[in-house]
Amino acid sequence: MDIQSNVLTITSGSTPTDTSSNGQAAKSTKERIKRSDFPSDFVFGAATASYQVEGAWNEGGKGMSNWDYFTQSQPGGISDFSNGTIAIDHYNMFKDDVVVMKKLGLKAYRFSLSWPRILPGGRLCHGVSKEGVQFYNDLIDALLAADIEPYITIFHWDIPQCLQLEYGGFLHERVVKDFIEYSEICFWEFGDRVKYWITLNEPWSFTVQGYVAGAFPPNRGVTPKDTEETQKHARLHRGGGKLLAAFKYGNPGTEPYKVAHNLILCHAHAVDIYRTKYQESQGGKIGITNCISWNEPLTDSQEDKDAATRGNDFMLGWFVEPVVTGEYPESMIKYVGDRLPKFSEKEEKLVKGSYDFLGINYYTSTYTSDDPTKPTTDSYFTDSHTKTSHERNKVPIGAQAGSDWLYIVPWGIYRVMVDMKKRYNDPVIYITENGVDEVNDKSKTSTEALKDDIRIHYHQEHLYYLKLAMDQGVNVKGYFIWSLFDNFEWAAGFSVRFGVMYVDYANGRYTRLPKRSAVWWRNFLTKPTAVPLKNEPEKSEDRRKRLRGST
């Protein structure tokens, strides 16, 4: 099909390309993207996650999470040896942070709840933390007072460490019962004001980085002889980092499929509880967020086209197809065989249709080709029989950002959206994360670090291609920036910055300053005459003293 023929050509199975004489027409069109190009009820927001921003790891009765334990006991697993003990101190600074959101013109804030902050002992029988519940109540109330809609993620990778130690966390089916209990507490405590729920964030990342690559807790996966290939795969998506020298070996050919299966059942049961007991009275919606690095065929061969489809199946389809159809993708059933768990008839009915919307986190794309090599051992990384590359004929798929896995490929978001509409029954979609990082260059002054034109262009171009997909009938309802603030980026620690708001880690006060991209978003979302953002110092001397460790 031809879309805006003077600017762009997109045909089925092809990569969008400029058709203007020098590409300048396309560039200028993207730069002119504006709020009014989207429906008036289209939601623009920003996103964070509990461990990445809250800090206060042992305040208010909070229990230890798997990430608390991992980063504090094995600091070598984080590229800069940092942790989220303080993170960016959102726990103590949330009121000021809501003011920032309001000034930016955001209408929604997506954040996650910390399971061990609400249930320090992992389950209800060990008690609910009143302080933890109060923190989230205060945050929700502050958002609503600022006319900002809360979008809550129930689980964004921080399981109570006590459950990890007791039975292996998501590797054991016992986690389903505990997750149901935790989810219901969330619905009960916050559902009167929260109208958008996300059960899980990127179950693919949690599963693969934790149980195949060994880069996330519980650091299970490969054996020593697998390290070179696994290191390559570990860097293919956000958050992947270096492998630990002493991580715990598991079985990368079976464990990820068990973990994923339990995650899907956790999701489905939580949705069932919400729909059965809370949705009618509370009037909310519930879904799941998944990630996709779009797999583009390396060549026009049928083998590579099929491989690209498998690549998408083994990442996005692994978790989306079950909630849409009740079954895993056919390619996974074929290539994984008996190692892929099966849903019982009852579970299939529970899982199928367990969503009101689908969240998508999109950052990048990759070239994919067929790999007919027969592996010597079973592993998720080789089960799809695919090879990935960020180059075609020595030409990168896009400009590289701060992380070695993130290449800027705006047209990939269009491909994902159109493919989802076609394959998954035209679902309601929210872009729950989209963003780009820069290296945290400590030699730069804070003033220099605020100049992030790369981020402005990244968002302009992705919004442009997202709008093209919407013009083709894709039912996208919202877009969330990753991230609102610079924060702790998992295995990358504080070595990269994703925020539109700069966080000054060095001054000990975690001062927030608007980058150029924040100003761009402000202008995009509000009237040109809006009051500009100001670089105001922190107001709380007590907070400064506490963070410095003084009295």
Curated annotation (Swiss-Prot):
Keywords: Glycosidase, Hydrolase, Nucleus, Plant defense. The record marks 405 as: Controls the gate shape and acceptance of substrates. InterPro entries: Glyco_hydro_1, Glyco_hydro_1_N_CS, Glycoside_hydrolase_SF. A motif (Nuclear localization signal) lies at residues 542-550. Disulfide bonds: none annotated. Residues 535-544 have a biased composition (Basic and acidic residues). It is found in: Nucleus. One of its GO terms (molecular function) is beta-glucosidase activity. It is an enzyme of class 3 (hydrolase). Its main location: nucleus. Its EC number is 3.2.1.206. SUPFAM superfamilies: (Trans)glycosidases. Optimum temperature is 37 degrees Celsius. Residues 1-27 have a biased composition (Polar residues). The active site is at 202 (proton donor), 433 (nucleophile). Gene3D superfamilies: Glycosidases. A beta-D-glucoside binds at residues 52, 156, 201-202, 363, 433, 482, 489-490, 498. Residues 1-33, 532-551 are annotated as: Disordered. Optimum pH is 5.5. The keyword Hydrolase applies. It catalyses: oleuropein + H2O = oleuropein aglycone + D-glucose. Major beta-glucosidase activating oleuropein into a potent protein cross-linking agent. No activity with rutin, luteolin or p-nitrophenyl-beta-glucopyranoside as substrates. Belongs to the glycosyl hydrolase 1 family. This is Oleuropein beta-glucosidase.
